[in-house]
Amino acid sequence: MHRQHILVVEDSDEDFETVLDAARRGGVSRPIVRAASGGECLRQLRATPRHREALPALVLMDLNTPGEDGRDALREIRNDTILQPLPLVVLSASANPRDLLFCYTHGANAYHVKPVEHALHLQVLQQIFAYWLASVVLPA
């Protein structure tokens, strides 16, 4: 059983707490690591040993973070041959069709709009975790 972590790129403390709550409620036992920006995400990934077992099982990415944002991180991850296979799910407040097109064009595996209502936000996160961590087969 893999104990790979989940990397959550989220600048909002409240939204990060919602991620942790959804993981607890969904029985997610993997460690959850936070990066507050796309730039911090890239620094963490580049500092990680370059083998599959050390990389995250899932990257959950907010687009609009300070400094280097989620768009920058998405581009860099998909241009790196070691990081490229990482499952990357965007969870953003933006429903702008340009953001969706950008993310899918640059290799996001999925795009979810963050619900405003807390209960729905929890539900979406639990569905993401169930699908990406329990249902699909990920690269080894």
Question: Model-derived features: where do they sit?
Answer:
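Conserved acidic segment of CheY-like receiver
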Residues: 3-24, 59
